[in-house]
Amino acid sequence: MTRGRVIQVMGPVVDVKFENGHLPAIYNALKIQHKARNENEVDIDLTLEVALHLGDDTVRTIAMASTDGLIRGMEVIDTGAPISVPVGEVTLGRVFNVLGEPIDLEGDIPADARRDPIHRPAPKFEELATEVEILETGIKVVDLLAPYIKGGKIGLFGGAGVGKTVLIQELIHNIAQEHGGISVFAGVGERTREGNDLYHEMKDSGVISKTAMVFGQMNEPPGARMRVALTGLTMAEYFRDEQGQDVLLFIDNIFRFTQAGSEVSALLGRMPSAVGYQPTLATEMGQLQERITSTAKGSITSIQAIYVPADDYTDPAPATTFSHLDATTNLERKLAEMGIYPAVDPLASTSRALAPEIVGEEHYQVARKVQQTLQRYKELQDIIAILGMDELSDEDKLVVHRARRIQFFLSQNFHVAEQFTGQPGSYVPVKETVRGFKEILEGKYDHLPEDRFRLVGRIEDVVEKAKAMGVEV
């Protein structure tokens, strides 16, 4: 093993000088291990990742944990390989940090477990699968208007506190319960409390045995937040490539991946780009996203929560992510304020899969008619606000009448929110969703009170609620 010495520490960035002309390769992992010799020192067990060759036998590295206690002159060892993490069955039901070390107090990973490097090339063109298959989520607004593709990339857009994490939790629940699929959850720069809650909820619901979890949370240095998405992706790739599984990869939050990159970029000596982001933003994003795909062996379907800074969709971070996505689920604060959950904007959310040759003619026509009705309602709202409903034509009154029922029927109760709402969650198959909206558009339920359509699953639940109110059905 080749040894070097720390010559400079700048926050999370550490410069190391090596001896005898040896230079570790880019992305190699370096180790610093130091036992405290007195009470003023701390034990150090730190991993660094090589980012730049500066010349003069010196490399600039990014720390994967806090650099507290580091001093110049400390010994550094080149491990000769990139960071590698455990993969396979041993990861299921466990929680890891960026280095693949378990952090759930459930014991160590077996020493003979397979470990894969977190940096690998994307699958070759000839290995990719080309057929398009829909992934049923059981969430009406998603399945009807912006369906997810197996092996696709889906973005969950929204500002702070509109329900991104709850939607992700529901998707994990539904995929595990209804499809029996394996999920990998990468918590990138989000709240530790949320990660802890998610872990315990998944343990209680029995979903944890089908899930591997990796966390690099808000309190951790940018190096950990930058690389933790790759750790999760490496675990997911094993299930796809070696076991031929269809894997779900959840990343919460992909914006923090970009944010962590921008934090270290200036310290690495790069000139900032637009809005202060790193000049390598598109490259870094591409290296991550191109590994998430369907191959002839299996697929990785990725659902990424994307924080939109100040609700500005032109910000370079969300804008760069957009170009990689097959579907977007936009969460709208106005809908959350109206009590419509999930607060998915039915007009702004899009999917490449909403085409008659993929979802079928009936589904496509119903979805487009729903969007048409909601768009017309949106246009009429200004007139209603100024002149009132009475000034509308009979045709427009009917549009408003049905649009409000559609808007409420796009909401539903979630299994993971049962403890807050006291209402049982609902999983609605795509066929039932299409049938329900088709019947609303045909005017079959025009006589039922609109508030009965709120937070229900199937159309039959609306009828039951109306009956309970004493309405003649």
UniProtKB/Swiss-Prot annotation:
It comes from Geobacillus thermoleovorans (Bacillus thermoleovorans). Its main location: membrane. This is ATP synthase subunit beta. ATP binds at G158, G159, A160, G161, V162, G163, K164, T165. Gene3D superfamilies: 2.40.10.170, Bovine Mitochondrial F1-atpase, Atp Synthase Beta Chain, Chain D, domain 3, P-loop containing nucleotide triphosphate hydrolases. SUPFAM superfamilies: C-terminal domain of alpha and beta subunits of F1 ATP synthase, N-terminal domain of alpha and beta subunits of F1 ATP synthase, P-loop containing nucleoside triphosphate hydrolases. PANTHER family: ATP SYNTHASE (PTHR15184), ATP SYNTHASE SUBUNIT BETA, MITOCHONDRIAL (PTHR15184:SF71). It is a peripheral membrane protein. Keywords: ATP synthesis, ATP-binding, Cell membrane, CF(1), Hydrogen ion transport, Ion transport, Membrane, Nucleotide-binding, Translocase, Transport. F-type ATPases have 2 components, CF(1) - the catalytic core - and CF(0) - the membrane proton channel. CF(1) has five subunits: alpha(3), beta(3), gamma(1), delta(1), epsilon(1). CF(0) has three main subunits: a(1), b(2) and c(9-12). The alpha and beta chains form an alternating ring which encloses part of the gamma chain. CF(1) is attached to CF(0) by a central stalk formed by the gamma and epsilon chains, while a peripheral stalk is formed by the delta and b chains. SMART domains: AAA. The gene is atpD. Produces ATP from ADP in the presence of a proton gradient across the membrane. The catalytic sites are hosted primarily by the beta subunits. GO terms for molecular function: ATP binding; ATP hydrolysis activity; proton-transporting ATP synthase activity, rotational mechanism. It comes from the Bacteria.
